[in-house]
From Swiss-Prot:
A Pfam family reported for this protein in Swiss-Prot or TrEMBL: DASH_Dam1
Stretches the record annotates as Disordered: 1-47, 140-294
Protein's name in the database: DASH complex subunit DAM1
Disulphide bonds in the chain: none
Biased composition (Basic residues): 13-23
CC annotations in GO: cytoplasm; DASH complex; mitotic spindle polar microtubule; mitotic spindle pole body
Taxonomic classification: Eukaryota, Fungi, Dikarya, Ascomycota, Saccharomycotina
Role according to the record: Component of the DASH complex that connects microtubules with kinetochores and couples microtubule depolymerisation to chromosome movement; it is involved in retrieving kinetochores to the spindle poles before their re-orientation on the spindle in early mitosis and allows microtubule depolymerization to pull chromosomes apart and resist detachment during anaphase.
One of the protein's GO biological processes: protein transport along microtubule to mitotic spindle pole body
Encoding gene per record: DAM1
The keyword Nucleus belongs to this UniProt entry's keyword annotation: yes
Species in which this protein is naturally found: Debaryomyces hansenii (strain ATCC 36239 / CBS 767 / BCRC 21394 / JCM 1990 / NBRC 0083 / IGC 2968)
Amino acid sequence: MASSPRPTTPNSQKKRSGRRQSHRSSGAYNILPQSPKIHYPVDPDNLPLEAPGNTEKFESLSDALEELDVNMTNLQSIHEAISDGFNESFASFLYGLSITMWCVDFPGCPSRNQWEKLKLVEGLDDRISELAEKIRSHREENERLKNRLASNVVESTEEVENHSDSHENRKPQHSHRVGKGPTRQVDEGDDTYMTNEGSFVVNPSAPSATRIPQPVKTAPRRFTKHTPPPPPPPPPADTSMHSSYRGPNLNQPPRYMRGLFDSTNRPTTPSNNRSKRVANPNRIQKATGRPPFR
């Protein structure tokens, strides 16, 4: 037997049979069911892949692949048109705009400073509108408080007038008589206009009784169409010669500060004698005879 010029692997059949024998000797070979080793007859006129159902499926698969190829071709053409035709043209257009922007001045467009000023003005307008709204609300509140205060003042004035009328009706009018001269009618004035809503004195207490007659303070009277004006006071009478049964005569001219303003501030004879008095010698002798103070 002539040797083959091609190299062959030695003992290849022996290795295959040994590997098959090792698989058969394993546990998996004993567990798995054995093949029945049934061989169906092969009909060359009726192959499995040439069945009508399989043929239709392969035809539909071929049509789908052709359609996919057409779609991919169209997508590739679109991509090339965008990358080559549109992107380059659009990029050149944007580049031209940027170059024109840097090289050409547009007088109608605001500059950066003008744009910042416009933004600042818009903020000021918003602030002004907000402040105007606050001022309007405060004015309404002020008007409401004024109306409320006016109503409170009217109510308090009516209450004080009613109180003063009831007080005048309840308390009879009296006059202070000094000496035996003509008397002066004392009229308690209406102090309605002197009172207000925030006054802490509404009903002043009556003064305590005293033997010394006090000067009467009459508040200015508010004249209305229903209140007649008081009569003028009578001229003061000379009551220096009459004595009062209630106390001292208070209608005398001032004597306490008379020497400060006229020429009566002169030393009198008794004061001069008092100042020129000679010390008593007996008193001096008694003072010298005393022991020293310890």
